[in-house]
């Protein structure tokens, strides 16, 4: 489900799917579970997004990162592998500062990521 938040950069209320983790640019971003890199995409507004397919309908999405150089579609990753670094390349949320935007997709639907993160992983 989506949470309505005020986007300081755009000056509007908008739906927000996922969790934002504030961190310094350059902070390592790691895979939350074992899986396969489904995609690495870059857009002007959202910056770079990495999607990992964990199987059984579960995917994790990492937005506003600098992807690791060796990260390519189809590459296998393990839980804890560095997949990139936090970036400030998300132009639609730049007033929020550098942060990781994290989402979880289950069977094609975006769900609350907190249900998949242990308190020690947040």
Cite the ranges covered by each PLM segment:
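Short acidic/polar mixed-charge low-complexity motifs
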Residues: 27, 56-58, 109
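Zn2+-dependent peptidoglycan hydrolase active-site motif and core
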Residues: 31-67, 99
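Conserved, short, structured surface segments that act as functional micro-motifs
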Residues: 75-122
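Surface-exposed connector loops and short turns at secondary-structure junctions
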Residues: 28-30, 72, 111
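Short alpha-helix capping/helix-loop boundary micro-motifs
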Residues: 22-23, 68-71
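Residue-level recognition of beta-strand microenvironments
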Residues: 40-41, 65-68, 86-89, 107
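Soluble periplasmic/extracytoplasmic beta-strand elements of cell-envelope proteins
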Residues: 1, 16-20, 49-53, 61-64, ...
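Surface-exposed, glycine-biased beta-strand/turn segments
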Residues: 1-46, 79
């Amino acid at each position: 489900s989506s949470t309505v938040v005020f986007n300081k950069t755009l000056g509007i209320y908008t739906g927000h799917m996922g969790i934002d983790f504030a961190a310094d640019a350059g902070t390592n971003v790691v895979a939350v579970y074992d899986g396969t890199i489904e995609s690495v995409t870059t857009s002007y507004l959202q910056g770079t997004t990495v999607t990992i397919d964990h199987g059984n309908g579960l995917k994790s999405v990492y937005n506003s990162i600098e992807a690791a150089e060796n990260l390519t579609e189809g590459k296998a990753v393990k839980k804890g592998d560095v997949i990139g670094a936090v970036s400030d390349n998300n132009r639609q949320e730049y007033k929020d500062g550098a942060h990781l935007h994290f989402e979880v997709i289950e069977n094609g639907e975006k769900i609350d990521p907190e249900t998949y993160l242990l308190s020690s992983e947040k």
